[in-house]
């Protein structure tokens, strides 16, 4: 039976790989890059919505629109995220705010928005794509680390709250991957030994396909060369 799955940050990288891996379902990808959204939507033949997850008003409207069209959202995958690296003293306040907004506030906004319909049905799955930085802090990534530690705290707290309503929440903690997240942050870090996003997407699929009475509170995945 097809499930309705919303994936934030779905226009590239891991988000796109997840959409492709789960494409036998009703997939709706979200991103604030409309050009890439349209391209990936055509490639994967999936639905999409332009949505900036840092704008809670836009998030509410987007989620309501999806629920109105599909009747329900079975799974939310909070994947959108950005990297911020460098000495804190040389980091602008705008970049600090952006990192916290995307990595921490964004998943909180989208989770809040989907919970109403999930509460009504007393079922649903939320996967929060965090990071190994939620456990181990990298050097000169102070704000990024803080945003991911915050997400782990949110994840563990919301699990207890919503499990009483029949909703499952999984914290997903990948190591660094072969994506352009470093490049977009202005970092030329070599990601060639990182995880292939296709392998990470298969791990997400495993969580999605678990039996209804099984919950995976936390799931970590790393490339063996970087263990």
List PLM regions with ranges.
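Conserved glycine-rich Rossmann-like NAD(P)H-binding loop of the short-chain dehydrogenase/reductase
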Residues: 24-38
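Conserved glycine-rich cofactor-binding loop
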Residues: 11-12
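The beta1-alpha1 cofactor-binding region of Rossmann-like NAD(H)/NADP(H)-dependent oxidoreductases
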Residues: 50-61, 93
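Residue(s) in the substrate-gating loop at a strand-loop-helix junction
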Residues: 131
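Substrate-binding pocket helix/loop in short-chain dehydrogenase/reductase
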Residues: 87-88, 95-100
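Active-site helix of classical SDR
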Residues: 111, 147
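C-terminal helical subdomain
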Residues: 171-172, 189-227
């Amino acid at each position: 039976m097809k499930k309705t799955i919303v994936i934030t940050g779905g226009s590239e990288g891991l988000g796109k790989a997840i959409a492709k891996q789960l494409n036998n379902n009703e997939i709706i990808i979200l991103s604030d890059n409309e050009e890439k959204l349209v391209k990936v939507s055509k490639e994967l033949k999936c639905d999409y919505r332009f949505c900036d997850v840092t704008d809670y008003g836009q998030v509410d409207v987007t989620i309501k629109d999806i629920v109105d069209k599909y009747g329900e959202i079975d799974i939310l995958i909070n994947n959108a995220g950005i990297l911020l690296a460098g000495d804190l003293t040389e980091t602008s306040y705008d970049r600090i705010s952006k990192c916290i907004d995307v990595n921490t506030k964004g998943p909180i906004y989208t989770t809040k928005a989907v919970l109403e319909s999930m509460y009504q049905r007393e079922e649903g799955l939320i996967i929060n794509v965090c990071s190994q930085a939620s456990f181990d802090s990298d050097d000169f990534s102070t704000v990024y680390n803080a945003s991911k530690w915050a997400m782990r705290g949110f994840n563990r707290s919301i699990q207890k709250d919503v499990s009483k309503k029949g909703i499952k929440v999984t914290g997903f903690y990948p190591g660094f991957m072969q994506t352009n997240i470093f490049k977009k942050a202005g970092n030329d870090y070599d990601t060639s030994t990182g995880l292939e996003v296709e392998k990470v997407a298969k791990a997400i699929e495993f969580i999605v396909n678990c039996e209804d009475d099984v919950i995976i509170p936390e799931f970590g995945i790393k490339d063996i060369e970087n263990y």
